[in-house]
Amino acid sequence: MRVADFSFELPEALIAHYPQPQRSGCRLLSLDGPTGTLTHGIFTDLLDKLAPGDLLVFNNTRVIPARLFGRKASGGKLEVLVERVLDDHRVLAHVKASKAPKPGAELLLGDDENIRATMLARHDTLFELRFDDERDVFTILNAVGHMPLPPYIDRPDEDADRELYQTVYSQRPGAVAAPTAGLHFDEPMLAALQEKGIEMAFVTLHVGAGTFQPVRVDTIEDHIMHSEYAEVPQEVVDAVLACKARGKRVVAVGTTSVRSLESAAKAAENGLIAPFFGDTRIFIYPGYHYQVVDALVTNFHLPESTLIMLVSAFAGYKNTMNAYQQAVAEQYRFFSYGDAMFISRNPRAPQEKVSP
């Protein structure tokens, strides 16, 4: 399967640089997986598409202000993007500099360069840094860090992004990118869903910067997926099994919830799904047999990305690429701050051939 099969033309003007004034005010393109039928609407239409007893599974990770600017004590500007917090004082980070710092190098970070850190070791593309400060990592980042807006949002982060680039139900700090399908849910929408009898459960997947990395191979099967930490606790497993037992749908909010649930399904030796705590490298592309997820709420993804491959595996390749063509023609807003899709699973998708 070729990566180029997942390419599409996207006018620059359709990339959303700011969210809608109201979270649930975005547009919603619904795709019926079995038939390929498309319906245009607004996000609050989701209320009519869900039935009492359906289970919405959200990712409750919280984005940390993970981007720091500064310089090496020996000179030379650099940019640090924290990928993973290891403990109160150590992190794994991407470091962008004209010359990479060596072990033992001292870094002066923050807009005032008053945060000292030491480069301890290099692990492939990541640098292990220690903050030489009494405060813990999260306190430091909240004080001096910048929100790590995606590379396609071509503007500096603003104070408002600390709230806007965050789901209203986020609880567990650790992500460097938002689970963006969840950005559309506001408190009134969540209350309306509960009132209708929609069940809710929360997984955690700390989204890493790897989610924005382009696929650098020609053949999909050669791609090595980045690793992210996920948690699917027992209460989520119980909620999924209860939902299936009553004949209702498990609806994943975002591709990170999909990857968490399907990782937990892979971990189950007996039965449909088991608790999962650990790193996942699950890579879902056409041919994959979904085990847990029946429907999906998701944003519009980058051409040739692993995420459009995941959606194609769910809805079917032809359905997905047709939906994206229609979204461009109808001028939907794309990517993190853009519009949303609601997709029901296409049971024939795993057998479908991928051909443009």
From Swiss-Prot:
One of its GO terms (cellular component) is cytoplasm. Keywords: Cytoplasm, Queuosine biosynthesis, S-adenosyl-L-methionine, Transferase. Gene3D superfamilies: QueA-like (3.40.1780.10). GO terms for molecular function: S-adenosylmethionine:tRNA ribosyltransferase-isomerase activity. It is found in: Cytoplasm. PANTHER family: S-ADENOSYLMETHIONINE:TRNA RIBOSYLTRANSFERASE-ISOMERASE. Transfers and isomerizes the ribose moiety from AdoMet to the 7-aminomethyl group of 7-deazaguanine (preQ1-tRNA) to give epoxyqueuosine (oQ-tRNA). This is S-adenosylmethionine:tRNA ribosyltransferase-isomerase. It comes from Yersinia pseudotuberculosis serotype O:1b (strain IP 31758). The gene is queA.
